[in-house]
Amino acid sequence: MSLAVVILAAGKGTRMKSALPKVLHAVAGKPMVQHVVDAAASLEPANTVIVYGHGGEQVKASVTGEQVAWAEQAEQLGTGHAVAQAMPYVKEDMVLVLYGDVPLIRPETLKDFVATVDDSTLALMTLTLDDPNGYGRIVRDGQNNVQRIVEQKDASEAELSIQEINTGILACSRRFLEESLPKLSSNNAQGEYYLTDLIAMASQSGLNVQTLQPNEGWEVDGVNDRVQLARLERIYQQAQAETLMRDGVTLLDPSRLDIRGRVQIASDVIIDVNVILEGDVTIEEGVVIGPNCILRDANIGAGTVIEANTLIDGAIVGEHCQLGPYARLRPGTELADKAKIGNFVETKKSYIGEGSKVNHLTYIGDSKIGKGVNVGAGTITCNYDGANKFQTVLKDGAFIGSNSSLVAPVTIGVNATVGAGSTITKDVGDNGLAVARTQQRNVANWQRPKKG
């Protein structure tokens, strides 16, 4: 059977107290609705329809995915009305309904769920709670068959005691939806068209209503305010941390790691507290990451040590490198094996060769540095003239003395030396020495100025 996924994302989210549409608030650095789109994509649906309303243009601009169609719900008249807006875009045999503010539903749960659906079966995802307050209840008959769902505001005292609740997620045939959605009524406490009323229709028409519960209750938790958003963020991060630890990664405090992207981390990696991993991050075996580091779209080679408070953004780091503390690697930086970038060093769009050292207080931009180069403290590559960027080349074995300025474009040759305090504006040949500083003048018996 072909599958269409309908994602309801039209709500304003008044309790978020935000100009941003609710479904665009992020969990792990990604909009909630994008989490749902990505989970749905694991099912390889023929079609995904997102029902939008409040802030629709923002939502459309923020979501990525293949074969996504958009249906507008101009008036917020309930979940049944929302699904009805999607139906003109649905031609597939089966329809799965998901919610843009329920971001942690797992692909494996969805796969098990849709596997229960056929022309004669409607699947309903439920959950049993100790405290079901606020949720619609699942009403069953004496043979344990699902009869209907009753919303809390419409429930009797007996129905309020039921602990099995509706999560809102359901799947059924397109034909059933096309036949049943026009029959929904808004004659209820909310004055809305409830999607949940379809369950009674299905039961009365002889459809088998099959229920399934997720392995983890938080998979179906929704977000209505920032407190709930923060709670799901912590749940997500804890789940990611536990997966890493089971895969052989040491986390010195699992509650103080944030993953905001797609990470691949090998075994025997050690990660200290308050580390943030964003975007696409690959970390090979034996890497040690100190506290308060941020890695964004970075590849880190085996055995590398990253000291505290280091930012690595869009960089490739080789094996057995040493970084930090307080280093900043900006996009386009590539370090060969055994390179060292020390404290208060910034690099950008530069290659640093094998075994080269840039240990202290230095800016390396638009540069190509060979093997075994030593760059002294306070060195600046002057790469920008206010309009254009130029390259600095330091060839193998070059030695740059402290407090030097290298005015690009400039090349320092193989095994060449630049004396400390120099401003270099011309190329230096292989094995040469360049010293470019004013002559020292000493004044004997100098009297300092006095105040007043």
Curated annotation (Swiss-Prot):
Binding residues for acetyl-CoA: A377, N383, Y384, S402, A420, R437
GO molecular function: glucosamine-1-phosphate N-acetyltransferase activity; magnesium ion binding; UDP-N-acetylglucosamine diphosphorylase activity
Active site: H360 (proton acceptor)
GO biological process annotation, one example: peptidoglycan biosynthetic process
Region (Linker): 227-247
Enzyme Commission number(s) from the entry: 2.7.7.23, 2.3.1.157
Keyword Metal-binding found: yes
Residues noted as binding UDP-N-acetyl-alpha-D-glucosamine in the record, renumbered to the chain: 8-11, 22, 73, 78-79, 99-101, 136, 151, 166, 224, 330, 348, 363, 374
Cofactor note: Binds 1 Mg(2+) ion per subunit.
Binding site for Mg(2+): D101, N224
Transmembrane segments: none
Region (Pyrophosphorylase): 1-226
UniProt KW keywords: Acyltransferase, Cell shape, Cell wall biogenesis/degradation, Cytoplasm, Magnesium, Metal-binding, Multifunctional enzyme, Nucleotidyltransferase, Peptidoglycan synthesis, Repeat, Transferase
Required cofactor names: Mg(2+)
Gene Ontology CC terms: cytoplasm; membrane
Compartments it resides in: Cytoplasm
Family: In the N-terminal section; belongs to the N-acetylglucosamine-1-phosphate uridyltransferase family. In the C-terminal section; belongs to the transferase hexapeptide repeat family.
PANTHER family: BIFUNCTIONAL PROTEIN GLMU, NUCLEOTIDYL TRANSFERASE
Subunit structure: Homotrimer.
Name of the protein in question: Bifunctional protein GlmU
Species in which this protein is naturally found: Alcanivorax borkumensis (strain ATCC 700651 / DSM 11573 / NCIMB 13689 / SK2)
Source species taxonomy: Bacteria, Pseudomonadati, Pseudomonadota, Gammaproteobacteria, Oceanospirillales
Gene from which the chain derives: glmU
